[in-house]
């Protein structure tokens, strides 16, 4: 069996800068450091190339590997509030942006590649982004919007609730891969 911990990056700074360059806040750095002991036994660590994800991974594990395809969904030209709409229609996308289905395929390809590199019995930490992770989970889970204004979701796997609320920074999911 192979195990992946799929984690959202820690708390980012607020500010006006390109999405991929947003660093962790001081609170986010402290939260990431607090996770180091929990993940001290991971064999490998992979990260989105976005700064906040890389910083999270670097605070938790030694020598994270950057995987370009783990980046956050490309929003494009958002002319309307699209957060709820993307969950109502997984093919919806803003001009120049990605749909949840496109992100799901990209993330699944990246994670399948990571799992393919792992040896039996290994554990990996994968640091990415809330929407990208949720898009990946659409391959296996039901996702229902509970409160669009607060970006709250209910995620269920085979009828069992695994998240009900906001996907918090430095939180995530444990995924087991058997007989791949």
Name what the model sees in each region:
Residues 39-41, 114-122:
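Glycine-rich phosphate-binding loop signature in dinucleotide/nucleotide-binding domains
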Residues 60-109, 163-167:
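Phosphate-handling substructures
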Residues 2-65, 95-101:
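Active-site-proximal alpha-helix that buttresses catalytic centers in soluble enzyme cores
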Residues 47-48, 105, 127-128:
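Short beta-strand scaffold positions
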Residues 59, 135, 139:
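Active-site signature of alpha/beta-hydrolase-fold catalytic machinery across serine-
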Residues 72-82, 88-89, 120, 138-180:
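Acidic, low-complexity terminal tails and accessory targeting/binding regions
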């Amino acid at each position: 069996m192979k195990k992946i911990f799929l984690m959202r990056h820690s708390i980012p700074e607020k500010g006006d800068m390109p999405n991929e360059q947003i660093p962790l806040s001081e609170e986010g750095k402290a939260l990431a450091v607090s996770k180091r002991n929990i993940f001290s036994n991971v064999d490998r660590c992979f990260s989105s190339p976005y700064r906040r994800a890389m910083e999270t991974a670097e605070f938790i594990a030694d020598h994270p590997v950057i995987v370009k395809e783990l980046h956050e969904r490309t929003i494009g030209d958002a002319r309307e509030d699209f957060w709820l709409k993307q969950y109502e229609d997984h093919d919806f996308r803003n001009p120049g942006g990605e749909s949840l289905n496109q992100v799901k395929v990209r993330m699944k390809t990246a994670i399948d590649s990571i799992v393919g590199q792992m040896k039996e019995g290994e554990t990996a930490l994968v640091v990415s982004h809330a929407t990208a992770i949720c898009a990946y989970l659409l391959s296996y889970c039901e996702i229902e919007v509970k409160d669009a204004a607060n970006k709250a979701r209910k995620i269920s796997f085979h009828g069992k609730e695994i998240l009900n609320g906001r996907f918090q920074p430095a939180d995530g999911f444990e995924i087991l891969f058997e007989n791949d």
